[in-house]
Design a protein with these regions (language model features):
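Histone-fold recognition with a strong bias for associated Lys/Arg-rich disordered tails
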Residues: 1-203
């Protein structure tokens, strides 16, 4: 799948996961990290008020406070200063590719939600190893149980909302959750926007 453009690939994200990667990108730049990692993305998704990941955390009885502490510690271990170079990590692109496979072939969906992303990570050895390195709490997740019961586990999530999946039937364009706007995400100077006060504060 290496020949698939980023615009096409990231255009498959639903509103929640797309906004999550936007926030992760801004967060990464403001921290001065070298690349946008899965760690940034998961951290930002969990910073939201609710979503698939929150319901999965509760279902498998992860310690949310310890998880948050572990993710913060993992962020602090990341190398800083890319010397002007800034990009997505290979793990982010691989996670989206694998999530798209699970999303379409396993669940018959047109947009990747947070649960699809986590299922894909858990079923890809290298990505799973990276997840466990972020926090031992992720070791409580059972890959097959999550994959088999995902829809029931995340039932009621804001990602069920029609507005979160509306992009699936919308024409590709700058106002859709995906489409060509996905490519623009990596060409906008978010650091400059932050300096000019055009970005909302990210916690």
């Amino acid at each position: 799948m290496a020949d698939i453009s980023r615009a096409a690939l990231f255009g498959k994200l639903n509103k929640t996961t797309y906004r999550g990667i936007e926030s992760a990108t801004a967060f990464c730049r403001l921290r001065g990290d070298r690349e946008v990692d899965l760690l940034h993305w998961l951290h930002q998704l969990l910073q939201a008020q609710d979503g698939d990941l929150h319901r999965i955390v509760r279902h498998f009885s992860l310690d949310a406070a310890r998880l948050a502490q572990d993710l913060t510690a993992a962020l602090d271990r990341l190398p800083r200063g890319g010397g002007g170079h800034f990009d997505l990590s290979a793990s982010v692109e691989e996670a989206v590719e694998r999530a798209w496979v699970h999303c379409t072939l396993r669940y018959g969906r047109q947009r990747i939600r947070g649960g699809d992303l986590l299922v894909a990570i858990l079923h890809t050895r290298s990505l799973r190893n990276g997840l466990l390195a972020m926090s031992s709490e992720f070791g409580k997740l059972r890959a097959e149980a999550l994959a088999d019961d995902l829809d029931a586990i995340v039932a009621g999530s804001p990602e069920d909302d029609a507005t979160d999946i509306a992009a699936a039937s919308a024409p590709a364009g700058p106002t859709a959750a995906g489409g060509t706007a996905a490519l623009a995400l990596y060409t906008v100077d978010l650091t400059a926007q932050a300096r000019e006060g055009k970005l909302d504060p990210i916690i």
